[in-house]
Amino acid sequence: MADFNSPIQYLKEDSRDRTSIGSLEYDENSDTIIPSFAAGLEDFEPIPSPTTSTSLYSQLTHNMEKIAEEEDINFLHDTREFTSLVPDKADNKPEDDEESGAKPKKKKHLFPKLSSHKSK
């Protein structure tokens, strides 16, 4: 069970952006601990949840779909730039030449200048 004799402390800012330490006050008649700065907020109406507000939900859904479409367009644009790097025809030759009976071919180096300098 919680110890209500020691107050819970938090940082708060005033109108001049000065930070001070506030404490939560316990009301024995209430089910919750209310911070001292929250007095008078009983009539505060929170933003409705998307399940209860269909207009807000549809607005958010529309915005998310629009963002997703824009990202898809950007993605397609980016991939078109690199299509020249992909060969037109796939090389379907078997990788293991020993199974096909052919002599293994000497593989070309990716960096011929580096391969020409052999260590002594």
Curated annotation (Swiss-Prot):
<dbReference type="GO" id="GO:0003677">
    <property type="term" value="F:DNA binding"/>
</dbReference>
<protein>
    <recommendedName>
        <fullName>Protein p14.5</fullName>
    </recommendedName>
</protein>
<keyword id="KW-1092">Inhibition of host IRF3 by virus</keyword>
<feature type="modified residue" description="N-acetylalanine; by host">
    <location>
        <position position="2"/>
    </location>
</feature>
<feature type="compositionally biased region" description="Basic residues">
    <location>
        <begin position="103"/>
        <end position="120"/>
    </location>
</feature>
<keyword id="KW-0946">Virion</keyword>
<comment type="function">
    <text>Structural protein required for transport of intracellular particles from the assembly sites to the plasma membrane. Binds to both ssDNA and dsDNA. Suppressed the activation of the cGAS/STING pathway by interfering with the recruitment of IRF3 to TBK1, which in turn suppresses IRF3 phosphorylation, decreasing interferon production.</text>
</comment>
<keyword id="KW-1090">Inhibition of host innate immune response by virus</keyword>
<keyword id="KW-0899">Viral immunoevasion</keyword>
<feature type="region of interest" description="Disordered">
    <location>
        <begin position="80"/>
        <end position="120"/>
    </location>
</feature>
<keyword id="KW-0426">Late protein</keyword>
<feature type="region of interest" description="Disordered">
    <location>
        <begin position="1"/>
        <end position="27"/>
    </location>
</feature>
<dbReference type="GO" id="GO:0039548">
    <property type="term" value="P:symbiont-mediated suppression of host cytoplasmic pattern recognition receptor signaling pathway via inhibition of IRF3 activity"/>
</dbReference>
<comment type="subunit">
    <text>Interacts with the major capsid protein. Interacts with host IRF3; this interaction interferes with the recruitment of IRF3 to TBK1.</text>
</comment>
<comment type="similarity">
    <text>Belongs to the asfivirus structural protein p14.5 family.</text>
</comment>
<keyword id="KW-0238">DNA-binding</keyword>
<keyword id="KW-1188">Viral release from host cell</keyword>
<dbReference type="GO" id="GO:0044423">
    <property type="term" value="C:virion component"/>
</dbReference>
<keyword id="KW-0007">Acetylation</keyword>
<keyword id="KW-1113">Inhibition of host RLR pathway by virus</keyword>
<keyword id="KW-0945">Host-virus interaction</keyword>
